[in-house]
Amino acid sequence: MAAVVAMDTQLMLGVGLIEKDSNGEALWVWCYPSTTASLRNLLLRKCCLTDENKLLHPFVFGQYRRTWFYVTTVEVPDSSVLKKVTHFSIVLTAKDFNPEKYAAFTRILCRIYLKYGSPVKMMESYIAVLTKGICQSEENGSFLSRDFDGRKAYLAGSIKDIVSQFGMETVILHTALMLKKRIVVYHPKIEAVQEFTRTLPALVWHRQDWTILHSYMHLHAEELEGLQMCTGYIAGFVELEVSNRPDLYDVFVNLADSEITIAPLAKEAMTMGKLHKEIGQLIVQSAEDPEKSDSQVIQDIALKTKEIFTHLAPFSEVSDDGGKVILNVEALKQQRFPPATENFLYHLAAAEQMLKV
């Protein structure tokens, strides 16, 4: 239990409250501890209370410069002690990706605020979780951090759903992720964007890297600047204008129209060949097997990925300084792989930082 407590102390960063009053104005009301103006503005943008379309999004999550944010928004019933407040959002910031964990905790904080109308009671529960990993209340529900394993969050999405929508084209997404390319996903509904984008890193399970995920972006200068500092990423947008920003992506996924487009500048690195066809067929075959769970499909793809790395092994050598493993490009060329395979292996080595600088 002590390890769990220590972990939560290190993972949770802060809690905040945004209210919308009866005049329709959304305001940042309170936070603990203090936060920066830029993060505050970002979170005001992410909570749906500043949206003009008045659509309520019960829960959204995303990442900004390695800080994860989780926002739960509720409508205030007439019976509540909160007067002149029509809606409010509870915001949690943390170092880890775990939407289910923070959705559960923010829901409890929402119930507490609806009942008492004071941030003090919320802060008590926040500090209890921060220091002990648990908060208990008969009327508002209990929360235990250790119930929410980080690996379960990685496996919560459905690879099968992605394959049923895109079929063989799923291999484009797999290739883009293997090569650490920039993937932008568009859908007008944020829930669809988040469900789809959170699942994609599982296609490269060997990395288990969800820091590449930016599931809720706006075409806002500060956000885009943070995004463009990343080498490869998965970025989700609800603004269709992002399709006119080829500077932001190598692969564009229009989720609403089930279309995947490779940007002209990425076409050379993303050339598909026999190897990609094999990978695509394996992904489709595994995903369409009714006996297999999503985690088994992920396992099948991971095994195929491991096999791809064995293709690189014979052409890899330890660098002269005895440090990292680098690719012997000449040895790769002498193997006379089909051009698309050689091209892919070369770009994969580049993505894995195996090229001699």
Swiss-Prot record:
It holds the Pfam family SPA. Residues 1-136 form the uDENN domain. Disulfide bonds: none annotated. GO terms for biological process: endosome transport via multivesicular body sorting pathway; protein transport; regulation of early endosome to late endosome transport. Residues 152-299 form the cDENN domain. It is found in: Late endosome. GO terms for molecular function: guanyl-nucleotide exchange factor activity; small GTPase binding. Coiled coil: none annotated. Its main location: other. Residues 301-357 form the dDENN domain. The keyword RNA-binding does not apply. Keywords: Endosome, Guanine-nucleotide releasing factor. One of its GO terms (cellular component) is late endosome. Interacts with the coiled-coil heterodimer of CCDC22 and CCDC93; the interaction is direct. Interacts with RAB27A and RAB27B (GDP-bound forms preferentially). Guanine nucleotide exchange factor (GEF) regulating homeostasis of late endocytic pathway, including endosomal positioning, maturation and secretion, possibly through activating Rab proteins such as RAB27A and RAB27B. Promotes the exchange of GDP to GTP, converting inactive GDP-bound RAB27A and RAB27B into their active GTP-bound form. Belongs to the DENND10 family. This is DENN domain-containing protein 10. It comes from Mus musculus (Mouse).
